[in-house]
């Protein structure tokens, strides 16, 4: 089973992904961590975004083929990246579910983004202006949407877990 999370920086994707990974004993693949490791390695690549996603796809597929549940944690901004995650699941012959994480309270979202700028690691994320001007395309297919505005991290994770359980209950076979 591949659980593909998407959403702008600061909406709570990684917090939810970590909680789900613990709850489901799943592999958590965070594209931001992959991209940071590539930058810190000194390797020169034409597009760090493309390289980070490609590494994520490969690691996800390897783990799915081992029978693990995988949680892909990335901005996942375009139909092309969303399709690529779904293709990973198809190649591994497992189900996949897409979950978009949003924060509908603009002030809360901005506060989250700005609070991360002074914290380690050195690459703690984009500025608010970079977040709001980012190329993030609307979804063109069915997916689950979870709004993290006004709820705690624990509540957001519980909402995500319940949404996945509801989704699974509509499947004929349990996730693998």
Regions found by a protein language model. Give the residues of each.
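Walker A (P-loop) ATP-phosphate-binding motif of ABC ATPase nucleotide-binding domains
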Residues: 2
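Hydrophobic anchor at the beta1->P-loop junction of P-loop NTPases
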Residues: 5
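P-loop (Walker A) phosphate-binding loop of NTP-binding proteins
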Residues: 8
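Conserved substrate/cofactor phosphate-moiety recognition/catalytic segment
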Residues: 11-66
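Conserved nucleotide-binding/hydrolysis micro-motifs of P-loop NTPases
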Residues: 33-35, 77, 102-108, 150-152
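Glycine-rich phosphate-binding loop used to anchor ATP phosphates in small-molecule kinases
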Residues: 50-96
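Conserved phosphate-donor/acceptor-positioning beta-strand/loop module used by diverse small-molecule
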Residues: 92-112, 146
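Small-molecule kinase domains that catalyze NTP-dependent phosphoryl transfer to phosphate-bearing small molecules
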Residues: 115-159, 167-176
């Amino acid at each position: 089973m591949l659980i593909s999370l998407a959403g702008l920086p600061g909406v709570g994707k990684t917090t939810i992904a970590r909680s789900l990974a613990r709850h489901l004993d799943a592999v958590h693949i965070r594209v931001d961590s992959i991209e940071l490791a590539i930058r810190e390695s000194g390797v020169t690549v034409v597009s760090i975004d493309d390289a980070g996603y490609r590494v994520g796809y490969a690691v996800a597929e390897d783990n799915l083929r081992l029978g693990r549940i995988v949680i892909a944690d990335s901005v996942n901004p375009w139909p092309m990246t969303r399709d690529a995650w779904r293709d990973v699941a198809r190649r591994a012959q497992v189900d996949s579910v897409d979950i978009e994480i949003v924060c509908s309270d603009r002030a809360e979202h901005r506060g989250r983004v700005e609070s991360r700028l002074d914290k380690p690691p050195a690459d703690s994320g984009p500025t608010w202006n970079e977040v709001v001007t980012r190329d993030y395309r609307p979804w063109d297919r069915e997916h689950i949407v979870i709004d993290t505005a006004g709820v705690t991290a624990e509540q957001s994770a519980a909402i995500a877990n319940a949404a996945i359980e509801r989704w699974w209950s509509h499947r004929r076979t349990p996730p693998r």
